[in-house]
Amino acid sequence: MPLRLHDTRSRGLREFQPADPPRVTMYVCGATVQAPPHIGHLRSGLVFDVLVRWLAVHGYDVVFCRNVTDIDDKILRVAAAEGIPWWQVAYRNYRLFDSAYRLLGCVPPTVEPWATGHIPQIIALIRRLIDAGHAYPAGGDVYFAVRSFPAYGGLSGRDPDALQAGESDGVHKRDPLDFALWKGAKPGEPSWESPWGPGRPGWHIECSAMSTTYLGSTFDIHGGGLDLLFPHHENECAQSQAAGDGFARYWLHNGLVTLRGEKMSKSLGNVLSMDQLLELVRPIELRYYLIGAHYRSTLDFSEESLEEAAAAYRRIEGFLLRAQELVGELPAADPQTGLIDRLPPEFVAALDDDLAVPRALAVMHSVVRQGNAALAETDKTAVRRFLGEVTAMLDVMGLRPPDDGSRLDALRRVVDNLARLVLDEREAARQRRDFATADALRARLTDAGIVVEDTPSGPRWHLRDLDLP
């Protein structure tokens, strides 16, 4: 089955066919860096990380552009409140975003443009819109004339006549629906020279200029959170196509993260930061959790569901540990190219069906259960095969345990040392002929998942099948 993705514009699944295979061009709206990342940002970053990885498995050469919005009304408000330069706010929070993405195992973008580094390209695009009759200067600002573009609203499915006015600060607008491409300078705010006087770019025009600068006038995929669909992506699409660009061929949007059914927002005081989440689980377990729901669905966060996901991931780790104990080192991390032929067909079918990660994870756990059954039979050949499949699936989704074998070796040594302490105490009890204590210690180990075998050369232990139904 070919790869199919849900295209927001067509409101249905479409077979993915890049314009210039094997090259795939993809733009994802990155962070507006006025604050540290929260769980919603992290989910969006991980959704498109899985897509980048899966496209690579299909043999595509992905050019992935993710922007940084480093000048914005919100950034300026934070800077004013803290009494520091706007760029200091932007850079401080960018570093937190970058650290979070790296900690969660995201593939770095091919290019990561910053808005303020592309003022000439933004000005050039605004000039094209004015020349085409789709934008107009007014009072030092420049606005996009929404009603000059009849297709406006097509991406998000909105009727312009039913829309409310957008930006309230545009006193020079000809129409309440028009939005700013360029904002005239205000006292105390940063500004750049332009044909319309000093000022700074509007949010929407930044993304249009940066995406087409690096990916061309028409590119394959535009992604972002569902909260960006309107007005941001609608405005991007309208101004870009009004300027004569084909712009994005496929639009993908990930669902939001809620808390007890309520959208997370700073104003409600219910956002969850990276630091808060990492007090509960490890980064790899957080990654497993955030990609575990289908990307287009709403993810309603709870500590219980996070803990369940972490436990599910630890079951996979338990299999890896026991399999490594039997057959040796884990297989080396597999390069993405050519990997598709070594994955279970059901796993491939799941990800080809609009990145159905929940189904793909179900396949992985099924293989883990088969692997645990093979371990119980000490079938090295079968264990090695299942181990290869599981590690290949983990590699595809960026879920291989950190530090690979070295981490498992360290964990194995810790468990071995603890088991030996108890076994030494058990042996001392047996020497004293205190068999009740010896049996109780063995039972304690069994309850902890450690099976003890008494052999002529002394007691040996192995981990019981820790996979839960």
UniProtKB/Swiss-Prot annotation:
ATP binds at residue 266. Keywords: Aminoacyl-tRNA synthetase, ATP-binding, Cytoplasm, Ligase, Metal-binding, Nucleotide-binding, Protein biosynthesis, Zinc. Its cofactor is Zn(2+). Its main location: cytoplasm. It comes from the Bacteria. Monomer. GO terms for cellular component: cytosol. The keyword ATP-binding applies. It is found in: Cytoplasm. GO terms for biological process: cysteinyl-tRNA aminoacylation. SMART domains: DALR_2 (SM00840). The gene is cysS. This is Cysteine--tRNA ligase. A motif ('KMSKS' region) lies at residues 263-267. Binds 1 zinc ion per subunit. It comes from Acidothermus cellulolyticus (strain ATCC 43068 / DSM 8971 / 11B). Its EC number is 6.1.1.16. It catalyses: tRNA(Cys) + L-cysteine + ATP = L-cysteinyl-tRNA(Cys) + AMP + diphosphate. It is an enzyme of class 6 (ligase). A motif ('HIGH' region) lies at residues 31-41.
